[in-house]
UniProtKB/Swiss-Prot annotation:
Keyword NADP attributed: yes
EC number, UniProt record: 1.18.1.2
InterPro entries: FAD/NAD-bd_sf, FAD/NAD-binding_dom, Fd--NADP_Rdtase_type_2, Ferredoxin-NADP_redctase_2
Keywords: FAD, Flavoprotein, NADP, Oxidoreductase
Gene Ontology MF terms in the entry: ferredoxin-NADP+ reductase activity; flavin adenine dinucleotide binding; NADP binding
Subunit structure: Homodimer.
Protein name: Ferredoxin--NADP reductase
Pfam families, alphabetized: Pyr_redox_2
């Protein structure tokens, strides 16, 4: 299993239910993937059974399901050799591979203004503990789900201004409605940052109205940048795996163009796919069942846990 985000962790658990021995390789230093890295406090609302659950609690529950699976963190997969089986980085010999890397290796898109080392200390691209910003004046730059979630979370403990280059936000409809109803968040739209300097331990940022000449000045103790991430799953192309618009192409069994290599979650793409965790959980079951049928064609496979 390559990737220890929610979908990868669930796939490892489901593989265990079928008696498969699994090793999970994760490039980050801790499991949980992008949800745990970017917004562990976020309430996830679209996972069946839970009316809401935080990313951190979801990770804890998924980890609690693991028993004899080996979890290796801080290991970025680079090499793959194919003989009768697969050999990963000259160390792990496996019969099948499931790629569950989400958007792959990701780097935050940087704040567009040149920052001195002193200014960099006030610029953040992710955080785990909201209390670090309590009582401060916070600027959040971005207009997607992450920016909206951060704004609503921090508005409970800080003075928050959300700056976006458009009047419309890209987040989920319910998040946009909640934001507009949250009188604790000051909205600055449509504005882009024009210049920045540090004065008396704070960031002074000039904001220019998009399509106009108006320039305003804002002072922040800290800013959070949610301009998205540059994702990269191209490492699998070195293995001969086909990509489609940057995503791993799969068939109906979640198998890639290379027999024995499967892809699930946001790492893969096919017509009509929706990038939500719940879909990834279903894809994990499809991939594991396909692997079982490939490795043990003589077995009568129990498809689901409620089979009689």
């Amino acid at each position: 299993m390559i990737g220890a985000g929610p979908v990868g962790l669930f796939a490892a658990y489901f593989a265990h239910l079928h008696g498969l021995k699994t090793v999970i390789l994760e490039s980050l230093n801790e499991p949980g993937g992008q949800p745990e890295m970017l917004y562990p406090f976020k309430k996830i609302l679209d996972i069946p059974v839970f009316n809401e659950i935080t990313a951190a609690d979801l990770t804890k529950r998924l980890l609690a399901n693991l028993t004899d699976q080996d979890l290796v963190t801080g290991h970025k997969v680079s090499q793959l050799e194919k003989t009768d089986e697969f050999v990963i980085d000259g160390e792990y010999q496996v019969r099948s591979i499931i790629v569950a890397t989400g958007n792959g290796a990701f780097k935050a898109k940087k704040f567009p203004l040149k920052a001195t080392p002193e200014a960099e200390d006030h610029i953040h691209y992710f955080f785990k503990n909201p209390d670090l910003f309590a009582g401060q004046k916070i600027g959040i730059f971005g207009g997607g789900d992450t920016a909206l979630d951060w704004a609503q979370e921090l508005s409970q403990i800080a003075d928050v201004t959300l700056v976006h280059r458009r009047d419309q936000f890209r987040g989920m409809e319910s998040s946009v409605e909640n934001l507009k109803a949250d009188q604790k968040v000051t909205l600055k739209t449509p504005y882009l940052p024009k210049s920045m300097q540090v004065e008396k331990g704070q960031l002074e940022i000039s904001l220019k109205m998009v399509g106009g000449d108006e320039v305003t000045q804002e002072t922040f103790d800290q800013i959070l940048v949610a301009y998205g991430f540059r994702a990269d799953n191209r490492f699998v192309s070195k293995w001969g795996v086909d990509l489609d618009q940057g995503l791993i192409a799969v068939d109906r069994s979640m198998q890639t163009s290379v027999p024995g290599i499967y892809a699930i979650g946001d790492s893969c793409g096919y017509p009509g796919r929706v990038p939500v965790i719940g879909i990834g959980f279903g894809e994990a079951q499809i991939a594991v069942n396909a692997i079982m049928q490939d490795l043990f064609p003589e077995k009568s496979l129990t498809i689901h846990s409620t089979s009689i």
